[in-house]
């Protein structure tokens, strides 16, 4: 309830927990495209957005479902998928002429090593220039899913039934979770080769 003559009713999107307008203003004043990262219960979304007087214009929009094109059969909402998504988004942005951006994680908490920063790491590796601190980026072992593989291997030995239940989605897709780092590297290689070829072709034209 509003109280007192100086009380200001927050904007609707702020009341609904959708937009931090102070942070958004700082990002817009940077005059750089924004790498917008959002999470849902099942997927992760990355967009490269430019602020215009008439409203935001989305230059690139992609989510982790697009990774299936490159053979990804792992979870679509984990750290590995987040990194690969950032890699794809970064390359797509470069193909559209974007060279630099600022990270926009909205109301997500800025937890070092989290999935939103895995997207950032992927975009950086794709060649985008984005201001950041190295301490927020997840370690390579975590990005590749090594921690998942180690846990899966241990669980498979100690409790095969729980292993099958916990990793049923991986197994249904034909991926042994203990082989996740290898699968990750294979998909990463496909993405890099695909977009590097496109970039080379664009330069040659």
Curated annotation (Swiss-Prot):
InterPro entries assigned: Rbsml_uL18_euk (IPR005485)
Keywords: Ribonucleoprotein, Ribosomal protein, RNA-binding, rRNA-binding
GO BP: any one term: translation
Cross-referenced CDD domains: Ribosomal_L18_L5e (cd00432)
GO annotations of cellular component type: cytosolic large ribosomal subunit
Molecular function in Gene Ontology: 5S rRNA binding; structural constituent of ribosome
Database matches in SUPFAM superfamilies: Translational machinery components (SSF53137)
Gene3D superfamilies documented for this protein: 3.30.420.100
Its job: This is one of the proteins that bind and probably mediate the attachment of the 5S RNA into the large ribosomal subunit, where it forms part of the central protuberance.
Family: Belongs to the universal ribosomal protein uL18 family.
Subunit text: Part of the 50S ribosomal subunit. Contacts the 5S and 23S rRNAs.
Protein name (database record): Large ribosomal subunit protein uL18
Source organism of this protein record: Pyrobaculum neutrophilum (strain DSM 2338 / JCM 9278 / NBRC 100436 / V24Sta)
Gene: rpl18
């Amino acid at each position: 309830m509003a109280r007192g003559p100086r009380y200001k009713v927050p904007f609707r999107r702020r009341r609904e927990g959708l937009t931090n307008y102070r942070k958004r203003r700082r990002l817009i004043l940077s005059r750089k495209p924004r790498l917008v990262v959002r999470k849902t219960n099942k997927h992760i979304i990355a967009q490269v957005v430019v602020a215009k007087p008439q409203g935001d214009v989305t230059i690139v929009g992609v989510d982790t479902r697009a990774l299936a094109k490159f053979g990804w059969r792992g979870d679509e909402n984990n750290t590995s998928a987040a990194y690969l998504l950032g890699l794809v988004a970064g390359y797509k942005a470069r193909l559209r002429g974007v060279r630099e951006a600022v990270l926009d994680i909205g109301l997500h908490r800025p937890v070092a090593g989290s999935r939103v920063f895995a997207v950032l790491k992927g975009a950086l590796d794709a060649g985008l220039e984005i201001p950041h601190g190295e301490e927020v980026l997840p370690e390579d072992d975590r990005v590749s899913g090594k921690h998942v593989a180690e846990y899966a291997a241990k669980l498979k030995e100690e409790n095969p039934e729980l292993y099958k239940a916990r990793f049923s989605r991986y197994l249904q897709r034909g991926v042994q979770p203990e082989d996740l780092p290898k699968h990750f590297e294979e998909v990463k290689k496909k993405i890099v080769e695909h977009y590097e070829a496109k970039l080379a072709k664009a330069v040659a034209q």
